Amino acid sequence: MKRILFVFLGLLAAGVLNAQQTHVDKIFVDTRASFHQDWRPGQYNSHFQGDFLNLHILGQISDKLTFRVRQRLNKKIDDQNPFNATDFLWLKYQFHPKWSVTAGKQAILVGTYEVDSAPIDVYYYGTFVNNWYQYYAFGVNVTYTPAPGQNIVLQFCPSPISPAKQNAYSYNLYWNGHIGPYWKTTWSYNYVEDETTRMMNWIALGNRFFMGPLALDVDFINRASFSQKQFFFSDWSLIGKAILTLGKWNLCTKVGYERNDAANVDESGHSYDLILPAGNDYLYYGAGVEFFPLGGDHLRLHAVWFRDNHDRINNFDLGITWRFNIYSRSAAKPWF
């Protein structure tokens, strides 16, 4: 599979790039590796690990048709799901300046910045995100752009909380935009089907505030079934993240708390929410530092500590992330 990808890459560079309308804009690789350590009283473990090796291809087929591919080269390809290692494989048709349709494999659109961030830029997640079956899926989006930087999206795709081969779906309404210059948003309402064919409602509100060198993320997710007694604030997640930028350095911290009341069960005693079962809570937190030696995002060093209230294991990662440009159609355009 990887050999086929590189042959395809060579063909693109040799032939397709010469077409007037059909061309590749960018081809690049990004990767992250780390030295992971964890310890609890009386026990210490450590190992080197490769976290990500991603190949990105972006381009257009015509002036109204654009595409994107992101392939994880270090992820095992499942015979039952041959696109398991493919995050993005989509085609976008911009049929009107304010309207577009996107079809193919893409991110399942759920609000909050913890979900919205590229996985290579996230060092640890909470239970809500960790327990999804899939984060990317084949589906269809219709996007309306009423103004620059404001996108309203309707998405129909497989459900993130059911196996990929199961006929369970998610119906998503998503807004990515801003309220003034200092408040960015990634909000969604998601009507999702779980592996038992029951439906759940997610209201996910991601907010990013800019205060000089400080960026503050505040994410809130409310999860509920129409059948449960208390719809709001009984099954929820609250996540806060802060990044203080000082020259080439980022000082970072993230804290999340997730809770599902014990009363959120059906007549048989089964939890409505299978991601965070009724009667459970989860607290996770950590802090770290990032250093960008060359000043841009193409080289990053990080040191991150994190733990939670369940395993009570201290985790500490030392790592490096780098991006390498293979091809850029316009030298004037940044490739990352």
Which residues fall in each region the model found?
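Outer-membrane beta-barrel pore domains
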Residues: 23-24, 34-44, 62, 79, ...
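Conserved adenosyl
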Residues: 170
